[in-house]
Amino acid sequence: MNGIDISSYQTGIDLSKVPCDFVIIKATGGTGYVNPDCDRAFQQALSLGKKIGVYHFAHEKGLEGTPEQEGAFFLKNIKGYIGKAILILDFEGSNQKDSAWAKAFLDYVYKQTGIKPWFYTYTANLNTTDFSNVAKGDYGLWIAEYGRNLPQGYSQPSPPRTNNFPVVACFQYTSSGRLSGYNGNLDLNVFYGDQKTWDLYVGKKSDQIVPPENKIFDATSDEFIFTLTKGSTSVFYFDGKTIFELSDPTQLDHIRGTYNHIHGKEIPSLVWTPEQFDIYLKMYDKKPVYK
């Protein structure tokens, strides 16, 4: 899924004209800042059927508070969005090295809502600060890394390597995004999941968005991985629609980690001979995407 994140800098952006599967909106900062365009953008995104996230910027300049103070301020101002949007801590302010502060904020929001927020920062901070406490808390990671940061449209790059976090939920890969319908730069993001996965992060119960738990494994529509063994070994991933050959061991680790994080169990795994694979392809009219 491709999406954008916006703040008051994009006030008035018409989301009906900008292509995006999701939009993440700055809601609050510190103990006193409220984005004046947040609710307008939120309501438009909701009416358009977009997936939504809302974030709090920690230690907004001049409005710094304790984790509990800022958490309470955030929740007070987004109470109408709970259950409709992913809740997020943007951690890149003056206290960006204070992992205990971040963990306390995330824990506070989780305790008050029963929903685990995402944690946002950038790779240079993540990989030079010990955020293992946040990772062990099972908070989803939204990570930023821009590289050369040249003007570009959507792409779906692999996530950067991150210390402690086995799974990247969302990757912000440029702040120089250019999309139709908006005359200016936008932050562009890729979410490594589908709409059902997004809804799980929002906090919707799994029985609201997926079939009953007693459904048996269906190799025609359910996610699974399989290994072909004959001479050399090849690993493939089926995402419910398309079969992909994996070219990098880190891809397999990412898929397994994401599936376990969302579903609370290991992704189904099969071992096939090439002959069995050919039968499957012919029976269900599947065409693999080879590396």
Model-predicted segments: where are they?
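Beta-rich nucleic-acid/ligand-interaction surfaces
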Residues: A124-K136
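Short Gly/Pro-enriched loop/turn and capping motifs at secondary-structure junctions
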Residues: S94, A124-N127, Y146-P151, S175-R178, ...
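Ordered hydrophobic segments in well-structured contexts
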Residues: G3, F22-I24, G53-Y55, I88, ...
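Functionally critical loop-and-helix segments that line ligand-binding/catalytic clefts
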Residues: M1-Q10, L15-S16, V134-E213
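Aromatic-lined carbohydrate-recognition surfaces of secreted/lumenal glycan-active proteins
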Residues: G114-N127
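Alpha-helix C-terminal capping segments
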Residues: L15-P19, N77-Y81, A135, T162, ...
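Substrate-binding cleft of extracellular glycoside hydrolase catalytic domains
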Residues: M1-I115, D138
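Short, surface-exposed polybasic-aromatic patches that bind anionic ligands, especially phosphate groups
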Residues: V210-K291
